[in-house]
Structures are given as structure tokens and as C-alpha cells.
């Protein structure tokens, strides 16, 4: 299997599992979160760890490799507003393949309407 580039935004338990699993498969992983301590926790297991607020399009736009990734995985489930703003920003920046974590049926419905490529529900 060829190595792919993934960006994971929102560094909680789901992101931790995904980063470890995808890294073990030989993929290139970048993580993004607004909390420096979370980013630091991930830094040793990924190729790039960035402190940025994904709800601010200008901050995402300043990360050149973001739009070159094969997939961007949004692991923000508990903060609906942050999840949706992040996805809208990614869409506006031209990210083609977005995978997003959903925390409820309503969240899933909105993600589908926004055109998210794949949706996962780790709490189910």
C-alpha cells in the first residue's frame, strides 16, 4: 500500500487512536490543535504537529501542506460549532476529501449537508 498524507484536526482520544494506527501503517501524519500541550503530546509520533485554531480560516490557510493532504480528518465531536466552522474553512480552502467525527444524529445530518466525504461515530 502506498503511503498517504493525512491531517488530523482536534486532538482527543479518537485522534490519538487514528494517529497511532495510520502511523503504524506507514502513512504521513500532520496534527493540528489550538492547545499547545495537546500538540506537544502528539509531536513525537507524527511527522508534523501544528498549533493553530481551525475555526480561523486565516490560520489554516497559513499551513501550506494542509491542502495537499490526501485526507483531512476532523476529530472535533463535542464542540459542534468548532466542528462546523472547521469544515467550512476546509471546504473554502479547497480540501477535497474530508472525514469528520460526529457526536449525534443532528451533527451527522449537518455534516452530510456540508458534503463531508466520510463520517464516523466513535461513541456508537
What are these regions (language model features)?
Residues 1-124:
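Cytosolic regulatory regions of ion transport systems
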Amino acid at each position: 500500500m502506498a503511503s498517504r498524507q493525512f491531517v488530523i484536526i482536534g486532538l482527543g482520544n479518537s485522534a490519538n487512536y487514528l494517529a497511532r494506527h495510520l502511523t503504524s501503517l506507514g502513512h504521513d501524519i500532520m496534527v493540528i490543535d489550538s492547545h499547545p500541550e495537546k500538540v506537544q503530546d502528539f509531536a513525537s509520533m507524527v511527522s508534523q504537529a501544528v498549533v493553530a485554531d481551525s475555526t480561523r480560516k486565516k490560520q489554516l490557510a497559513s499551513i501550506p501542506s494542509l491542502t495537499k493532504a490526501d485526507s483531512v480528518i476532523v476529530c472535533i465531536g463535542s464542540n459542534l460549532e468548532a466542528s462546523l466552522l472547521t469544515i467550512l474553512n476546509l471546504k473554502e480552502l479547497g480540501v477535497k476529501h474530508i472525514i469528520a467525527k460526529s457526536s449525534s444524529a443532528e451533527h451527522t445530518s449537518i455534516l452530510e449537508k456540508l458534503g463531508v466525504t466520510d463520517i464516523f461515530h466513535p461513541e456508537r
